[in-house]
Amino acid sequence: MSMILSASVVRVRDGLPLSASTDCEQSAGVQECRKYFKMLSRKLAQFPDRCTLKTGRHNINFISSLGVSYMMLCTENYPNVLAFSFLDELQKEFITTYNMMKTNTAVRPYCFIEFDNFIQRTKQRYNNPRSLSTKINLSDMQMEIKLRPPYQIPMCELGSANGVTSAFSVDCKGAGKISSAHQRLEPATLSGIVAFILSLLCGALNLIRGFHAIESLLQSDGEDFSYMIAFFLGTAACLYQCYLLVYYTSWRNVKSFLTFGLICLCNMYLYELRNLWQLFFHVTVGAFVTLQIWLRQAQGKAPDHDV
C-alpha cells in the first residue's frame, strides 16, 4: 500500500529539527530510514532545493526554502506528484504560521512541535487519494516536476551511518564531486552585494574601453591590439569574480586570488591609458571582491540532532 509514513521540518543551516509527525511506523525498515533522515539533515545545505533519496522500499523526499527544509518518508510506490504536493502544503502553512525570525533564533529541537497537528491532518488527507483528488489541482505540480525533476541523491553522498560505511559507497567514488556542485554558500551580505555590483561596473568599463580599442585598432597600424586584449582580459576577470562570489566551486579561494592577480597585471599594462585614480579604483574593487569571496564560504555542517 502506498502511503506517507512520517514528515519533519528541519532548519537547513544546522539541521535543527523544528517539528515532526509522531506516529511513525516502527518497523525495522522505517527505523533504518530514520538514520537516513538524520544524515540528510546534516547535509541539507549541500543539496538542491528539491531532492529524493531512494532507500529501497522507501523514499525520502524533501524541499528547502527560506532556510527551512520539509522532509517526508513514504513507501517507494507513493506518487512523486503527491509527495511534493504534500511538502508544498507543509511549506506554505509553515511560512504563514511562523516568521523567519522565530525559525532563525530557535535553539531547542522541536520547538514548533504544535505544527505536528497540521502535519497529521495533511498526511491523513494525502494517504486517502480518492478524497484528495477532488480538493487539489495537481497539474501545476506535475508540470513543475516534469520541467525540474527532483535531484536523485546517490546513497554514497550520505557518507556513513553510525560509523559504518554504506555499502553503496564502493560504487560511487565520484560522490564528492557531485555533492560539491550543489553545495550552497552562506547568505549574501550587503557588502557582498556591493562587491558584486562594483565588479560588474569594472567589467563594463573594461568592456567599453575594449571596444574603443578595437575602433582605434582599425584606424591605426595595430599598436592598440595589446591594449584591446588587456581590456577584454580585465572584463573576463571581473565577470569571473562575480561568478565566484555567487557560486561554489572547488579551489574557489585560489581561483579568486589568481583572478585578482590577473586584474592587477592588466591594470599595470594599462598604466599609460589610465590615471592613478582609475587604477586605484579597479585594483581596490578587485581586492574587495576577492575578500568577499573569501568571507562567503560554503554553509557548514550541521550538529548531531535526532530527527
UniProtKB/Swiss-Prot annotation:
Residues 2-187, 248-253, 296-307 are cytoplasmic. It comes from the Eukaryota. GO terms for cellular component: endoplasmic reticulum membrane. The modification Phosphoserine is found at residues 6, 8. May be involved in vesicle transport between the ER and the Golgi complex. The modification N-acetylserine is found at residue 2. It comes from Rattus norvegicus. Residues 8-119 form the Longin domain. This is Vesicle-trafficking protein SEC22a. The keyword Iron does not apply.
